[in-house]
Amino acid sequence: MARGQQKIQSQQKNAKKQAEQKKKQGHDQKAAAKAALIYTCTVCRTQMPDPKTFKQHFESKHPKTPLPPELADVQA
């Protein structure tokens, strides 16, 4: 019967240790990366992190489409 009690205590200790480790780890990389993608291409709906990348994408992928007004003053 003693082993059953030890097992329960060990599981609780391990769960506490795992929770502390997860808390210490910080944030989710995937969520942070998704939050950084704030510019969306109006033609193909691709998301980009900054206006410079957005302008480069637009000029290379959609050369015949006129540049959106938010990209007019951005230097690539």
From Swiss-Prot:
Bias (Basic and acidic residues): 17-31, 53-62
Keywords: Cytoplasm, Metal-binding, Nucleus, Repressor, Translation regulation, Zinc, Zinc-finger
Biased composition (Low complexity): 1-13
Keyword Zinc part of the UniProt annotation: yes
Keyword match NAD: no
Superkingdom per UniProt: Eukaryota
PROSITE patterns: ZINC_FINGER_C2H2_1
GO cellular component: a single term: cytoplasm
Designated name of the protein: Zinc finger protein 706
